[in-house]
Amino acid sequence: GNAIPTGTVIVLENIYYDFGKWNIRAGAARELDALSALMKKYPSMEIELSSHTDSRGSDEFNKELSVKRADAAHRYLVARGVDSKRIKPLGMGEALIRNKCKDGVECSEEEHQYNRRTEIKIIRIDEPVSIKYEDKGPEVIDRKKD
């Protein structure tokens, strides 16, 4: 078969969402397309998709929204031929805000956008690769006020 060159570096990016929504944006689709190709190339690879919201809205609403976001990313990969069992979707709600923008803190749309993400983590891979997690941040800031 094709031996994977040792030291292949897999770079994984976070994907981002619009406010209150869970649809897969264009930038996210590009990342997930690349991820599905990687998962086909490395058959042992299993991933965790942990989805997060910004702090606006109730904890319950955000928990549900994050589950929908994780599921949307999961479904997207499965639609591209990845076995569902290799993907573990997790909805984290607003539990892991990455900046100061917790409940009641005034923040810009940019700052809120940074929190609306799914983080992709490799939880298993048998092939000899190194993994790099990068975050260029969202390519689009959703400024729509619902």
Region annotations inferred by a language model:
Residues 1-46, 122-146:
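Periplasmic peptidoglycan-binding/tethering modules of Gram-negative envelope proteins
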Residues 50-146:
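Periplasmic OmpA-like peptidoglycan-binding domain that tethers envelope proteins to the cell wall
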